[in-house]
Amino acid sequence: MPSGASAAGARTAAADPLVSQGRTVTASSVEAAGLEPGKAVDGSTSTRWASAEGVDPQWIRVDLGSPHTVSRVRLTWEAAYARAYRVQISPDGSTWSDVHSTAAGDGATDDLTVSGTGRYVRVYGTQRGTPYGYSLWEMEVYGAPVSGGGTPVQANGQLRVCGIKLCNEHGKQIQLRGMSSHGIQWYGQCLNNASLDALANDWKADVLRISMYIQEGGYETDPRLFTDRVHSLIEMATARGMYAIVDWHMLTHGDPMYNLGRARTFFTEIAQRHNGKRNVLYEIANEPNGDAVTWSVIRDYAHQLIPVIRQHDPDAPILVGTRAWSSLGVSGGGDETEIVDNPVDAANIMYTFHFYAASHGSAYLNTLSRAADRLPIFVTEFGTQSASGDGANDFARSQQYLDLLAQKKISWVNWNFSDDFRTGAVFTPGTCPNGSFTGTDRLKEAGVWVRDRIRTADDF
């Protein structure tokens, strides 16, 4: 254990999330193309930053985006390591305070327990350990935001299902409001530091739903790539104090059993990696559909997959899709009684309901109202348009739904946080590459409407 780090301190630091991954990073120099400083905060130990060779001092600096209390810094050195270096923290990128220093670096991974508050963290090398430069596979900073009023996760901590409601760690019934991504295989460029800063700070969202399609060019085409993307997005949501819903976005194959093997593999890794976090929820089956996909099929799938997650993450809420496009069975001629009479035999779970206001009228609204008095419900997707995610907005019907959700403290997530051409995407086409996400100038009509409702003060 590095000098100054105690066993007790290491346990405390481990409770804080990784807050540096994907953040803006700069360096004093770069040895060559492909070794840029961003490679040291990309979550991969196969890419690295390297400074110019033969020059002291050199530094690498990460901008956490807002003031944080920093409790841990982990440095994974390449062969070109620092013999002497300092870890420093700053409120403004100009005035620096040392939180760790050593003159006996040996090139091993340095896992440092530190204590400091600031927006910027810098590793400042003063003596190279080799004739080369300085090179890091990863620079990981762990901590928590200290923004005024606290983040949703700071306010609520580990969520749990209490009776038929979602509650925070204090036992208070709460409602989360936020946005769903579009498919990350198509619109991953809409999920970056600037857009998620806007979602957390300008929109004041509580939750980000990370929609990873399985087919349609998604997970099945490259499981490693898409799993790593989800890891990264969980870290980015965590760094901003938002909850993250990991959405297993099955669609074309409406039977969840079709992808059960893939789901076991994916959720095992996600739960293993993130089980120490307090902000992760697992949505294990987006919109089961098809005449042969009965509630019994979905329930059996849940009974097989939930233990896979619980083996590694015993505390996070798990969200179970419902029959006929997560409509509680309404789109297939049923209703909530099929679940009430035969619920999933597991604790700390909720059932999902999706609606699109221009397509789903009073039958859906009434079913939701009844179901919410008997079952724990989470609306993990809704739109103000038709079920295609396009067409005219029905804001009047949408408001009826949102009024009911507020009354019954049902959490909701809107579809979708992208610049897709359809009316359901909140940004106008071309917004994401240009990076202008705050305010309303680049929002469609539906985007302005839902942003206003997400920004309404939370009752935490």
For the regions a protein language model found, what residue spans apply to each?
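Extracellular glycoside hydrolase catalytic/binding regions
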Residues: G183, G188, L260-L281, A285-D419, ...
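Exposed aromatic-hydrophobic patches
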Residues: A108-V114
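Aromatic-lined substrate-binding rim segments of carbohydrate-active enzymes
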Residues: N192-H253, L260-T265, R310-H312, R397-K408
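Short, conserved beta-strand segments of beta-strand-rich sandwich/propeller modules, principally
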Residues: R72, Y120-R122
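Short beta-strand-plus-loop segments that form exposed binding edges in beta-rich domains
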Residues: Y124-Y132
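N-terminal carbohydrate-binding accessory modules
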Residues: A14-D16, V146-V207, E220, T456
